[in-house]
Amino acid sequence: MNNVIKKVDLTDAKSSNLVALIYSNEVILVEEAFCPNEIKLKFNEIAILSAIKTAHIMKVSIRKELEAIFHDTGVLFVKHSVDYGNSQSITMHFEQFKKLQNAIENLNKNR
């Protein structure tokens, strides 16, 4: 995998420590909580989620193992591990999601 292009701190008063590691074509969300969680999103998936958010759809499967559940203040990402029978989840508030989108857009402008 390529090196991290940018690290964005998405932590806010309403959430655990949340960091986005931006690579050339994907983002890895890392939540440093009691049980650290990590979820990968492709740039096109982030763009699709933004469109879905404005369409007021409540739940969408991003990939076989990953779904997004929208609520009033944000989105809950749930990653299911079929091999291990467990799941990981990360909640992003819409302000955090917008901050991540802006960071990606700024990187794309500077390329």
Name each region found by the language model.
Residues 1-111:
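Positively charged, low-complexity terminal tracts
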